[in-house]
Curated annotation (Swiss-Prot):
CDD domains referenced in this protein's UniProt entry, alphabetically: AGPR_1_actinobacAGPR_like, AGPR_1_C
Family: Belongs to the NAGSA dehydrogenase family. Type 1 subfamily.
Protein name per its UniProtKB record: N-acetyl-gamma-glutamyl-phosphate reductase
GO MF term list: N-acetyl-gamma-glutamyl-phosphate reductase activity; NAD binding; NADP+ binding
Organism field: Corynebacterium aurimucosum (strain ATCC 700975 / DSM 44827 / CIP 107346 / CN-1) (Corynebacterium nigricans)
Catalytic activity, EC: 1.2.1.38
Pathway: Amino-acid biosynthesis; L-arginine biosynthesis; N(2)-acetyl-L-ornithine from L-glutamate: step 3/4
Compartment(s) where it occurs, according to its Swiss-Prot or TrEMBL record: Cytoplasm
PROSITE patterns (UniProt xref): ARGC
InterPro entries registered for this protein in UniProt: AGPR_AS (IPR023013), AGPR_type-1 (IPR000706), NAD(P)-bd_dom_sf (IPR036291), NAGSA_dehydrogenase (IPR050085), Semialdehyde_DH_NAD-bd (IPR000534)
Keyword set, alphabetical order: Amino-acid biosynthesis, Arginine biosynthesis, Cytoplasm, NADP, Oxidoreductase
UniProt xrefs under SUPFAM superfamilies: Glyceraldehyde-3-phosphate dehydrogenase-like, C-terminal domain, NAD(P)-binding Rossmann-fold domains
A single Gene Ontology CC term: cytoplasm
Amino acid sequence: MTISVAIAGATGYAGSEILRLLLSHPAYLSGDLRIGALTGHSNAGQRVSELMPHLPQLADRVIEDTTPEVLAGHDIVFLGLPHGHSADIGRQLGESVTVIDCAADFRLRSKEDWDAFYGGEYAGSWPYGIPEVPGNRDKLKGSNRVAVPGCFPTTITLGALPAVAKGLIEPDLSVIAITGVSGAGKKASVAQLGAETMGNLKAYKPGGTHRHTPEVLQNLQPFTQDSVSVSFTPVLAPLPRGILATITAPLKGDVDKHSVAQAFRDFYAEEPFCLVLPEDQQPETQNVVGTNMVHIQAHVDERTQRLVITAALDNLCKGTAGAAVQCMNLTLGWEETSGLPQAAVAP
């Protein structure tokens, strides 16, 4: 059986990254996966070669308008649409279609959190696409609906989770996360101009106002009886891709660097996309770009008795499109790592 796949919002950064990954997926190369409709409302009628010349295999394909009628009839539909647009289309696609949503519409389990951070109609929640969080993988297997997580929550969750779950820290987290400009999407804005971003660093959405904050809390709270709090400040950097998060929290009990290192290694021992680095190495964005990997390090600050965790990933790959393809593999019962790079391009 050949699986047909459509991508809504194919010309955006998330959509085009999904296409890049699918084009090297073993199922596509063997003919078991077919790339069907490619849609993009503002680019309808244009050829892929005009918009995404880095995808020559699809050069002659024409972008269609994003409508439920165009997307219906496919086995898998990836939604790479702005927040608020996915819920309406998702409702109109039948249960026979597996919908994998890269927006925020179905991530939050709490209506109160949705109202506080997004507003508008609350659409409910779908199985959440970080398979590495215990319990998530089983919910994703065979599911016909998937909510792909935000890029910051993936970085922070996978960085902090071993420490929270193993009781190494008081779960009062302070997070500063540096991100590349592609995280804001392709929509034109003065703040994203090269003249505004090159040679510049800028914090934004400070004071707990960033929309990804409740996702982090939602992910970590089930793994501790203590109340989790997160003070999160994102920082925009002149990078196309990549996130580097620094997470600190007070240590709990008798914890040293050896027990911390062992706890992190044990937690991710069976996870192919989570690499806990040797003590003398630090996560770097250049070492994860283009991959579905998360590189993680944890150090004990003995003077302040705090744990310092650093985590790096590619916001467009493991942070969005790679997670979407990883979840697709799980919903179809395929090998979870299929089509997902672990080796970066260096330098």
